[in-house]
Amino acid sequence: MDDIELLNDVLGHTADLVEGVQPGDWERPTPCSEYDVKALVAHMVGWSASFDAAANGHTPKGDPTAYEVTDKSAGEFRLAVTSIVGGWRDHGKDREVSLVGAGGMPGQMVFDMTLMEYLAHGWDLATATGQAMPYSEDTAQEVLIRAEHGPLANEQYRGSDQPFGPIVDVPLSAPAIERFAGFMGRNP
């Protein structure tokens, strides 16, 4: 599977999970301890606009953390992920992009961040809502490899005051999605 197919697979399945959230799910806790399901969906949809802008060569507008869930959120997310995939397909990764405003970041790095962000939060959402885990072993393994060889392998991003918790040891015999969740600081 090439990079664009991988991205389409992760984002498409994650959009399916967002669409699968039921009204009774909003207050459920998630493995991402700072979010319940509603706050997690708000985070995912809010940040999708920034990832969309980066993929399409625009400067992100607005505060992704200010997004509030509505009855249109699943549709907004589906549109954003379609645009994200199209942006990376049309413009490539060999360029600098802006994810959070001023300053450029390597396109490949932001592309990989997109994969990790939405695979991790897709796992969180499926786990919290009881939906079937939609990601294939190959997809999860490829994203795990990228995560293990990227900046998140550095301890400076992990801990109580950092975006990610410590790596949770998961047996090598476990499915790749569980090993990925452990790498991202979740306890599968």
Regions found by a protein language model. Name each.
Residues 40:
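Extended, alpha-helix-rich binding/interface surfaces that flank or overlap catalytic cores
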